[in-house]
Amino acid sequence: MRYTILFITLLLLSSCHSMRQGKQDLDQHTSQYASLLNLHETEDDYTLVQIFNPWQPSQVEVQYLLVPANDAKWNDVSETKAKENYGDLTILRTPLQRITLTSSCHAYLLDELRALDHISVMCDTGYVMAPSVHRWMHDGLAFDGGSSMAPNNEILLAAQTDAVWISPYENASTSTLSHLPLTLIYCADYMETSPLARAEWMRFYGRLVDKGHEADSLFRCIETRYDSLISVSHADTLKARRTLLAELPYGPTWYVPGGCSTSSLLYQDAGYDYLWSQDNHAGSLSLSPEAVLAKAIDCDRWIFKYMNTDGDWTLNDFLAQNPFYGQFKAAKIGEVWGCNTSYSDFFDVTPFRPDILLESLINDDERFFKKLK
């Protein structure tokens, strides 16, 4: 599983003003796109981070205060004052030196920010596609932490990990990690409801490894490029908006992206008429194959992700999986596109580089999804 199931600051008298000011600002949502993340820069160059509960968005799940490790002004009294002003929070001395990651997309992001040297443990290494991360581990600079569902506690302690990045899941327990002297970083980016909202979380992650300015700059570039690509897509009036079906059934259930999901919004930004775009769910819809056939039998294109270590499917391979597939128009006209995640870096790249995926979908360049022939 690519993602783990696991899911202030300031001085004495001189700091009191800025902390009170920060508290007054907490009612303001400072993220431009992300709905589950707030970053508050204080006057003393500290960063107060609020992460909201994805299932109760009005509730703050956890607060962190990022304090530079070399800040000589910070002391125990500063911490007491910070907690008096902001309530329950975790103090993080940044940059975090030795991080455990449970998701390959965060490893890819740290590579983009030139911060691989902060990774001490990587879980689910079989799903990591980035060559630089593999070299980092091959050279003995990071340990294999085992499964992201249950990281090897002995490895985490031996690696002297000071923080574990986990993706929180509803009702999931972190009891296997909670008794360890480790800080948990809640990575709820995957629950955001737009491509740029998820990508904006890089501004938080960058600040954890002293790459805040680089992360801000990268995000601005991604935002600009993404918006430019939308303009190109919507300006192409010569190409009618093609109806789109996404994903494959698993057993008796077909999970398609909800209309308010990041996938749905990205498909629409790429110029597709996504068939469930009017739905109001941010997650996946659990449908029967018959219900999908009734709605999508005449779809112009069908895209999906699959795993096959023996190589990419041909169209005949695909149709042989289930005779049911041949009833769809897209299968009949050869408009079936698949992404073999056994070899593709789709899950590494696209969460924080939605611009790359958007460009690929617009240009049909087969960077991720390849036409089955």
Regions found by a protein language model. Give the residues of each.
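Positively charged n-region of N-terminal signal peptides that target proteins for export
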Residues: 1-4
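C-terminal motif of bacterial Sec signal peptides marking the signal peptidase cleavage site
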Residues: 12-15
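Bacterial signal peptide processing site
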Residues: 17-19
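A short, structured surface patch at a secondary-structure boundary
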Residues: 55-159, 163-169
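Basic- and aromatic-lined ligand-binding clefts that recognize polyanionic substrates
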Residues: 98-104, 108-113, 214-270
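Short helices/loops that flank or line small-molecule/ion binding pockets
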Residues: 150-160, 287-298
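Structured C-terminal subdomain patch of bacterial secreted/periplasmic proteins
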Residues: 195-221, 304-373
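His/Asp/Glu-enriched short active-site or ligand-binding loop at hydrolase and phosphoryl-transfer sites
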Residues: 263-284, 303-306, 338
